[in-house]
């Protein structure tokens, strides 16, 4: 619980502008890990230099952060929120678990820059994301999805 609370203390600035921060998260993910762009076919035709200003990238980034905000606010009691997310990402989108670990690190960097998440907050976010990702991985296995 303490980890969730520590991350939530810095969540306000992220929540205040999901589109901008979400676009930044996805653009940075695609820049730092170019292989992840292949997992988003709807962004395939966008030139790398245009990703940051693309409305679709920002909108999807906003969705990612909005869902993460819901998971954070559940403070660990997130099974009902996570199951449908795990199901769609395993069966429809076919997103390997490693990619959630990659985006979690990017979210941590963006939160440090834009929301003042300090070193202790970074550790708390890693702990929180480890729990969420482990639960997703269990859902994936239950669904028979292995990368």
From Swiss-Prot:
Report domain Globin positions: 2-141
Q: Which residues form a coiled coil?
A: none
> Catalyzes what?
Fe(III)-heme b-[protein] + nitric oxide + H2O = Fe(II)-heme b-[protein] + nitrite + 2 H(+); H2O2 + AH2 = A + 2 H2O
Q: What is its EC number?
A: 1.7.-.-, 1.11.1.-
- Where do the annotations place O2 binding? 60
The alphabetical list of record keywords is: Cytoplasm, Heme, Iron, Metal-binding, Muscle protein, Oxidoreductase, Oxygen transport, Transport
Signal peptide (from-to): none
GO molecular function terms noted in the UniProt entry: heme binding; metal ion binding; nitrite reductase activity; oxygen binding; oxygen carrier activity; peroxidase activity
Pfam families associated with the record:
Globin (PF00042)
- Residues involved in nitrite binding: 60
Matching InterPro entries: Globin, Globin-like_sf, Myoglobin
Annotated binding of heme b, by residue: 89
Kindly state one GO CC term assigned in the UniProt record.
Answer: extracellular exosome
Location of this chain's protein in the cell: Cytoplasm, Sarcoplasm
Looking at the keywords, is Iron present?
Answer: yes
**An example of a Gene Ontology BP annotation on this entry?**
removal of superoxide radicals
Q: Which domain of life is it from?
A: Eukaryota
Top EC category: oxidoreductase
State its role: Monomeric heme protein which primary function is to store oxygen and facilitate its diffusion within muscle tissues. Reversibly binds oxygen through a pentacoordinated heme iron and enables its timely and efficient release as needed during periods of heightened demand. Depending on the oxidative conditions of tissues and cells, and in addition to its ability to bind oxygen, it also has a nitrite reductase activity whereby it regulates the production of bioactive nitric oxide.
Q: How does it assemble?
A: Monomeric.
Q: Which family does it belong to?
A: Belongs to the globin family.
- Protein name per Swiss-Prot or TrEMBL: Myoglobin
Q: Which organism is it from?
A: Notothenia neglecta
């Amino acid at each position: 619980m303490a980890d969730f609370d520590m991350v939530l203390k810095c969540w306000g600035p992220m929540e205040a502008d999901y589109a901008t921060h979400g676009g930044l998260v996805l653009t940075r993910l695609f820049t730092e890990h170019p292989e992840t762009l292949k997992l988003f076919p709807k962004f395939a035709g966008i030139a790398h230099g245009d990703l940051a200003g693309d409305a679709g990238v920002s909108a999807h980034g906003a969705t990612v952060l909005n869902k993460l905000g819901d998971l954070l606010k559940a403070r660990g009691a997130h099974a009902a929120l996570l199951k449908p997310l795990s199901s769609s990402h395993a069966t429809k989108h076919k997103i390997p678990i490693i990619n959630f670990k990659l985006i979690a690190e990017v979210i941590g960097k963006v939160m440090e820059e834009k929301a003042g998440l300090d070193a202790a907050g970074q550790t708390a976010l890693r702990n929180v994301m480890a729990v969420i990702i482990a639960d997703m991985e269990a859902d994936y296995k239950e669904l028979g999805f292995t990368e």
